[in-house]
């Protein structure tokens, strides 16, 4: 019990600094055994307020389609077919504000925002419909081509069927948040 015992004395049981409530909220653990997901997080006033402020702030910003003139300057392209979709009404069910607010909410909660691009027989874009980010996966096929896999549910219009739908990149508007692989955003 001499000199070395003072250096190598036993210590109390180490404490885990990750047991705090802030850590559990941010990283998912909880003493109650309930997991925190996007929907349950939105039931917290602080999360709801932050998401609402950010999504509404983005949705209220003016959005226009521009074209270059012969002189090299830009002007609003009000007659462009995409102008109405982006500025006024992306689909018959929602305004541009609601569409952009929805996509921003998905981006904040899931790290990605997706919309299906609907085209007519000529290939012209006629509508944009938001898709639930938690039911979308992005992958590559055997040849390295990107594809999107969306899990349909009974409530999805217009098919009202369950199942998986494969979408080409040209049929999906994908807005990723910051991520690690360049394909999908990291879910916060």
Where are the regions a protein language model picked out?
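Structured, contiguous alpha/beta core segments that scaffold functional sites
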Residues: 1-188
